[in-house]
Amino acid sequence: MEKECLHEIKNMENAVVFSSKTGNTKQLADEIRNVLPEETIKYFGSPETAPLDADCYYVGFWTDKGHCNAEIGTFLKKIKDKEVFLFGTAGFGGDTEYFDKILKKVEKNLDRSNILRGSYMCQGKMPNSVRERYMKMKNSPLPVPNIDAMIENFDRAVSHPDEQDLEPVSYTHLRAHETELH
């Protein structure tokens, strides 16, 4: 299956379009770029200048309030009759169910004419300002539910995306499973 899919990729013009606030999503985009045959990459960069005439789009986002960031949401709505692979990062991690909910929301931005080739998400580190805000919340006179769990999650996220996060993105997009959007 992977050989067939790789053959298809070699005969396509691919665009890797992403937005990365903290560098996490760019790490995933770089990994995808390294796996794709160089001669097939028509575009690599932000959605502002991305062409709309590639055959296959690898679209990366950072998570904003349980959804993709706005500029990627807008870009996804412009893509028609294309093959799409979604990838993203979220500061809150360790929960596949949470990632699946985000991906389902992001998929809703895609026109039904597109074919979703696959998707992948992993945890990403957050800016230190987030931890500082959590500590202020913890030390405030008003109790904040789950603040200790939020701080623990922040501390776990510091090393992500790591090698274990990057490895699957290299192979996940090569899957031959295609899901038509309904």
Name each model-derived stretch.
Residues A29, D162-L174:
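Short, amphipathic alpha-helical "lid/cap" segments that border enzyme active or binding sites
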Residues D148-H160:
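Short glycine/proline- and acidic residue-enriched helix-loop micro-motifs
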Residues G45-R133:
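Helix-loop-strand module that forms the ligand-binding subsite of alpha/beta enzymes
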Residues R133-P145:
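Oxidoreductase cofactor-interface core, primarily capturing Rossmann-like NAD(P)-dependent enzymes
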Residues H173, E178-H182:
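Single conserved hydrophobic/aromatic residue that forms the stacking wall/gate
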Residues E13-E31:
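N-terminal beta1-alpha1 ligand-phosphate binding loop
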Residues E31-E39:
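A short, Lys/Arg-enriched amphipathic alpha-helix followed by its capping loop at the start of a domain
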